[in-house]
Regions:
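Class I S-adenosyl-L-methionine
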Residues: 1-18, 23-25, 30-101
Length: 101
């Protein structure tokens, strides 16, 4: 068991061009061993694609997260809680997680 939890970082990828990521965003993505990213039903991970245009993430553990677009609040909350549990599992192992969005 790890006595120290990892840190969660939210990293915005900006308007869509990889060269517009901030230096701080790039540095955080370099330092974190786990990168979480929203994934569409078709499997697309647009925020991750943008980040990968700025730096090589092949050595990172990629955590795809699914969020429902349902109008039903309970279903949305369930998808948020599922994503939180997935991220928390890495944090409890002492691994830092950066979520791109």
């Amino acid at each position: 068991m790890n006595d120290t939890n990892g840190t969660f970082y939210a990293v915005g990828v900006g308007p869509g061009a990889p060269e517009l990521l901030t230096l701080q965003a790039v540095n955080l993505l370099r330092q974190c061993p786990v990168i979480a990213a929203p994934q569409t039903r078709s499997g697309q991970m647009l925020a991750l694609d943008i980040a990968q245009g700025a730096l090589d993430l092949r050595e990172k553990e990629i955590l795809p997260l699914s969020f429902t677009m349902s109008r039903e609040p309970a279903l949305r909350e369930e998808s948020y809680q599922t994503a939180a549990r997935q991220i928390e599992a890495f944090l409890q192992k002492g691994l830092d997680v950066a979520m791109v969005n």
